[in-house]
C-alpha cells in the first residue's frame, strides 16, 4: 500500500440542550483525520437564533492547523457539521474544502458530502 488512502470524513452533531458543539466537532474531526488530510472545515448555527446565520471556517491543512483555537474561539452553535477531505477528483485547493455554505432565498445551507458531483459546471 502506497500511503494512506481513505475517502473523507463527515461529522455532524446537534445538542438538544442548546450547548456549544464546536469543541465536539473539533474532536470528532480530529478522530476522523485519518480519513482525509488535505483540508477540513466546520459550520455551526444556533437553532434558536436568526435564520440563515451560519458561522463557518475551512481551509487546506490538518484539523490542528486549520481549526486553531484563535480561529474557532468565537464560533458557537448548537447544530453543526464538519468535514475532512481526501480528494479522489478535483484539485487540492481551498475552493474545494468543505462544508459547502450556500445562501439562498430561505436562508443559508451548510452541506458536507463524500463523493463526486458529476455533470456539474
What does each model-found stretch correspond to?
Residues 1-121:
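N-terminal glutamine amidotransferase
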Amino acid at each position: 500500500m502506497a500511503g494512506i488512502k481513505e475517502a473523507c470524513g463527515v461529522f455532524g452533531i446537534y445538542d438538544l440542550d442548546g450547548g456549544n458543539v464546536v469543541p465536539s466537532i473539533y474532536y470528532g474531526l480530529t478522530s476522523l483525520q485519518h480519513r482525509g488530510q488535505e483540508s477540513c472545515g466546520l459550520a455551526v448555527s444556533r437553532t434558536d437564533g436568526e435564520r440563515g446565520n451560519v458561522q463557518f471556517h475551512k481551509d487546506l491543512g490538518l484539523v490542528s492547523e486549520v481549526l486553531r483555537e484563535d480561529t474557532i474561539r468565537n464560533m458557537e452553535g448548537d447544530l453543526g457539521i464538519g468535514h475532512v477531505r481526501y480528494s479522489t477528483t478535483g484539485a487540492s485547493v481551498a475552493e474545494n474544502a468543505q462544508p459547502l455554505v450556500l445562501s439562498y432565498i430561505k436562508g443559508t445551507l451548510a452541506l458536507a458530502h463524500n463523493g463526486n458531483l458529476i455533470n456539474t459546471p
